[in-house]
Amino acid sequence: MSDRLFIFDTTLRDGEQVPGCQLNTVEKIQVAKALEQLGVDVIEAGFPISSPGDFNSVIEISKAVTWPVICALTRAVEKDIDVAFEALKYAKHKRIHTGIGTSDEHIKYKFNSTREEIIERAVAATKYAKRFVDDVEFYCEDAGRTDNEYLARVVEAVIKAGATVVNIPDTTGYCLPEEYFEKIKYLKEHVDGIDRAIISTHCHNDLGMATANTFSGVMGGARQVEVTINGIGERAGNTSLEEIAMILKCHKGLGIDTNINTTKIYPTSRMVSSLMNMPVQPNKAIVGRNAFAHSSGIHQDGVLKNVQTYEIMDPKDVGIDDNSIVLTARSGRAALKHRLHVNGVELEEHKLDKIYEKFLILADQKKEVTDADVLMLAGADTADAHAVRLDFLQVTTGKGVKSVASIGLDISGQKFEAAASGNGPVDAAIKALKKIILKQMTLKEFTIQAISKGSDDLGKVHMQVEYDGSLYYGFGANTDIVTASVEAYIDCINKFKKED
């Protein structure tokens, strides 16, 4: 059994089926190039017959990338295969991915057919695709609900017809991990000629088991996995590329390797999230904002002593600069002391006790406490010499008029004021702030999130800015979203000022 696992990325095909996440051709090329840098083996670039846009995207992606196999999806229909081959004409390495439903539900209700007719159509499609390309992948749609004996007959028939990869999708996300393992194992043991083809997994996440099923399939003998960045995909999504890659990296004893450059995982995740306008849930494994963040006092104390106490991965392995100690109401004194130390503040124990009491009150109000907040608690006399703090903010806005903002900042004890107008209160406030902070900062990401449902409750703003070629993240929380936005921007400023 080969120890090489091939990564088939379907972000640009299955992943793009998420409502509202469609990309244009230029954006798809950006993602394809990032996937090439990431090290995926196969890029499923689209379903060419489905639309002129998909057809054109497959053509342009084929031109743009060099070494990955470019794959085009079809049904078991000759016209589909003709169009797919035409779209792949510029690809250095071509694959046609054809197939048909094999479960009784699909055979009876979708195709109004019989098991024998489905096998005939499967063989015919495989042979037809083989006339155009050497590399043909065949998918048995809804294989998860197809009985193993019949599935083995289909797989054996298409391998004899020339299929080089056989895809066993859990299309509905129904399988249990042990069932999927047994299904793959059954094919390995009962299909004549199975060693002439690679078995591929393609698992959906309807019951939250996509990654578990995919991993079980690998353990059963599959040597290609079909995955997406951030686990995006139709309905509840697909298996996450980053999760499979890091499972195998962390469990080296399995002896299964991929070609993935894991340090590219996080940047690729951010790119896909941004282009598709689909935020990654904060607690998403590997790439979520909180994946390497620790807020529990017990956990924080352990991580500060030795990261291996609560971290099984180095954040740098996935392209994140460092882990994050997130200060919340559950944080202990050790975490607060650490954040003060990082910001150059050393306090005697009795002073730390007083600040910790204030910190707990603030944390109950803000949920997450920033470095700027910690410095404010420590007092102006102990704050970083470059710390920027918001003194006041006044905004006038209304329908049919431009918003006007006046802002006051305290920078190292000096007071500064400015005013500006803008398209909306946040724009006006940020423009006023920029009149004081004369830095060429580019806003890269701006996210507003309500912490709870009430109109008078806190809103959170997460912001990413680029300054002098580096990215900085800021956070603000306030019952007023404009103030929260300004606090997030100031948080970014304070972070890059520490490096000046």
Where do the language-model regions lie?
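Catalytic alpha/beta core domains of metabolic enzymes, predominantly
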Residues: C175, F181-K305
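A mid-to-C-terminal "edge-of-domain" accessory segment
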Residues: R4-L5, T11, M246, G253-A419, ...
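Alpha/beta enzyme core
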Residues: L5-I7, Q17-V42, F55-A64, E78-I199, ...
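Non-catalytic terminal/interface segments that mediate subunit docking, oligomerization
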Residues: Q17, Q22, Q30-V31, E368-Y472, ...
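Short beta-alpha connecting loops at secondary-structure transitions
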Residues: W67, P169-T171, E226-E234, K249-T258, ...
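Short, small-residue-enriched loops and turns at beta-alpha junctions
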Residues: D14, V18-P19, F47-P52, S103-E105, ...
